[in-house]
Amino acid sequence: MLLNLSGDSLHTGDATWRRRFFSWLPPSHHFLGLLALVLACAPLGAIAGRPPLVVPTQPGTVLERLPRGYAGLMPTTTVSPRVPSLLQIQALLATAARSGDARLAARADALLSRLPPPDSNAVLRAKAFAAQHRHDFTAALRLLDTALAKDPDDNDGRLARAQIQLVQGRLDLARKDCGALTLGMQIDAGALCLIALTMRRGDEAQAARLVDRLIAQAGADPDLMRYLLATRGEIAARAGDTDADQWFQRSLASAPDDVRTLAAYARYLRARGRNREVLGMLASPPDTDGLQLQRALAAHAAGSADAQQLVASQGRRYALAHAVGTQPEMRDEAEYLLTLRGDATAALELALRNFRQQRDVEDVDILQRAALAAKRPDALAGLQEWARSQHLDLSKSGVARK
């Protein structure tokens, strides 16, 4: 399909999409579906490849050809509504999370700025998701704090805040929010929160039990099931279980282009030296920086004939992002510098910058490896102090290395 920017809004039609996408949740918890998508995929930092920037002179100029399936997000009229629909914005954020396409998150951000005050809690949460997608965690937390100050029983906002705290390495604060959700008998939100917390603590056995319980209760809903299966695959990968393949493959069976699942499965396969399988799986992947990096890393490790070409292409992606003022996913760029360029010093510098705002398992892993390669054990002092404060054992991170 074609993207024409002569209009200023995006439409998703009626509530059919909403009923289908959120059908697994009770009516008061529709927001959880969007939350699971956005928070699971936001760390990917995926930025779609872009052609050279030009300024069009004709209103009918085709700026870019977008992937199949975007038609539902495009304008159905050339007349822009004065106030965009929150449902439209949520659809954009959900699709951006599934596809890794930052263009859609940017569009959602622009539409959010046009909503009239005062912001409802639903709008505050959507703005927080958009902020997290661009890695502005401070703004995201501020928005969620505002929502919870207005309504301490906003369980969706509390779950969102806990997830961001986990990404930033504040397990102590996330534990409080998870506890509040559980004590408040918010079964769905509490379970998702506890799964994320136990995974980050490195308790794969407990996380697996929680996910298995939800899988048994999920019924036939494809969206919830796909999310849970991918999460179960990540847990198995971190634990070194041999059944990780089946979990990832079951998740991909219903959504072969799901960015989050593809990236996690690719990391798992590469960690086990199965690089040729990664190349087969990512032969025609969604065009995101994160998946293209996985492809380049696999080609490099396998000695593939196109490895040099893929590495050069990845470098151009990062150069273009910097040229237009966009910061690529720092841990991915650090991986590129360390593994594909052999520049441990630059990789360590970037990994340290990344660690200031993201402290997930993969963030810790790239920092440790970059410091080791650069012969800079002193660079890990901050990491070690933080791990002690959060009662984490760095020797048992269980990461499926990138």
Regions found by a protein language model. Give the residues of each.
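N-terminal leader/linker segments that initiate helical-solenoid repeat arrays
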Residues: 44-122
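Residue-level recognition of tetratricopeptide repeat
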Residues: 90, 94, 129, 163, ...
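Alpha-helical repeat scaffolds
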Residues: 105-113, 138-146, 171-182, 205-216, ...
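Alpha-helical adaptor scaffolds
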Residues: 129, 225, 312-345, 352
